[in-house]
Regions:
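A broad detector of short, well-ordered amphipathic alpha-helices
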Residues: 12, 122, 139-142, 188
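A short, structured active-site edge motif that brings together acidic residues
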Residues: 99-109
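Acidic, divalent-metal-coordinating active-site segment for phosphoryl/phosphodiester hydrolysis
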Residues: 136-149
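Acidic two-metal-ion nuclease catalytic site recognized across multiple nuclease folds
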Residues: 147-206
């Protein structure tokens, strides 16, 4: 299943703050999407359309999440994936979102070259870390926090640079007008009775 921060929506944000090794604050909230949640996403996450029916819109939730983050460093597993969605959502609402971050996936690749899989689930299994609801935002965040603490305990003394935060970067691509070749292809497909939800004049591609 391929998702793209430019074309797909966030339906849930989950995060937590850790102070002195303990969870001090939590952020858990659904976002009301503009389109219906697909059966594939429901199958993966367990989140249904009924669950988000009364959720707040993206602008309201993302504003509160940015306030929640304050100046803290973000930690995530393949963090650029989550950061790209959050940044794109914020940008659509005219809100800035620039953060420093630490990626537990990059750390795992450095300190565990012998492991075939460095996915969050595989690493949690390796270290016997419980994840009560995999693919749900808050529980994945909690599992990642525990994973980071574990990796830091075992490996940071000998690999301090690996655990240093860095600036998270994701360039939001500006839509570009479709090329004449693309428009001609769409017209041919339309004549062959292939249907699209896009008006050809409004169709765009990302550079």
């Amino acid at each position: 299943m391929r998702v793209d921060p430019m074309n797909n929506e966030i339906i849930e944000i989950g995060a937590l703050k850790v102070r002195d090794g303990k969870v001090s604050e939590r952020f858990m909230e659904f976002i009301k999407p503009q389109e219906l949640i697909s059966p594939a996403i429901t199958g993966l996450t367990g989140i249904s359309n009924d669950m988000v029916a009364s959720a707040r819109p993206a602008r309201s939730v993302i504003t509160d999440f940015i306030d929640f983050c304050e100046e803290d460093i973000l930690i995530g597993h393949n963090i650029i994936f989550d950061y790209s969605f959050t940044k794109c959502t914020a940008a659509r609402e005219g809100l800035p979102f620039e953060k420093m971050g630490i990626d537990t996936l990059k750390i795992a690749k450095k300190v565990h070259p012998e492991l075939e899989s460095k996915s969050l689930s595989a690493l949690c299994e390796h270290y016997k870390i419980e994840n009560k609801a995999a693919h749900r935002a808050y529980f994945d965040a909690l599992a990642t926090a525990k994973l980071y603490q574990t990796l830091s305990h075992y490996f940071e003394p000998d690999n301090p640079k690996t655990f240093k935060p860095s600036q998270l970067t994701y360039k939001i691509r500006k839509p570009q007008p479709a090329t004449p070749k693309q428009l001609a292809l769409l017209e041919r497909l339309t004549k062959n009775k292939k249907t699209f939800s896009h008006n050809t004049e409004a169709f765009s591609c990302n550079a």
